[in-house]
Amino acid sequence: WVKAVYLTVDGQPALDVADGLSVYEMEYDENGNLVKALHKDAKGDLMLPKRNGYAGVKNTYNEEGQCVKTEVLGIDGNPMFIAENGYAGIENKYDINGYVCEQTFINTEGQICDTRQGMARSTYVNDEHGNNLEQWFYNKAGNLCLNADGVAGIKAKFDSVGNLIEYMNYDVKHQPVLDNNGFAGQRFAYNELGLISEMAGLGVDGKPCASKELVYITRMTYDRKGNLIRRAFYDASGKKLMLNREGEAGWENTYDEHGNLVAYAFFGTDGKPCVSKGLH
């Protein structure tokens, strides 16, 4: 679609309550790629919606149809700096398989700039399936830097079907580092339905470490429909139940025939019912 107009019951221009705008307008190139997405008022003038605060987005494509630049637009139709993000646009580069391998954040003049996330450029290493094996963050001077999560890079591993099974965080010296959540990484296991059945926070030594919830390893059990029926917390050995910060070792969920959660019960390290200190 190229245009959406909000109207009252008598056919007069109306405002979308959530955004405060009247018209969404799209422009496409000859290949069907979205070039512009614009927000307009009832008079057809560009306006700033309530939720995102910009008048539109402009995309630029290369000969392969890949989006190489995305810019945020103001009411004058020119690039607009978004203070919340710390940039006005993003430039993309692609690897031989067509996956993004580099993103550069730019200001209204098209120059590289440091963002609110702490970096000016991100680089990616992808496998042939598009799984992101490595990601590194750089400032506008071209040096590795810590992002808002406190890491300079991430390395990840995936299983044969593309499930993330482990990632580790690294500092500017390529050494494992704890992020703002207190993890240097996480490890995951999956059941036959592809649902996460176990996850563990990792320390800089690659071994399970305690989360902010005071839990080392969390295990999940599901029914045949994929509903979570049990969540349990374990120590670093993975053999003993342990209490989290709320004073529970886990809980069990009960569902009705429609899959609606109708009850849950907390249990302690002895597997017996207990009182939780928190709200869930």
Descriptions of predicted regions:
Residues 1-280:
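Buried hydrophobic residues that stabilize the cores of well-folded domains
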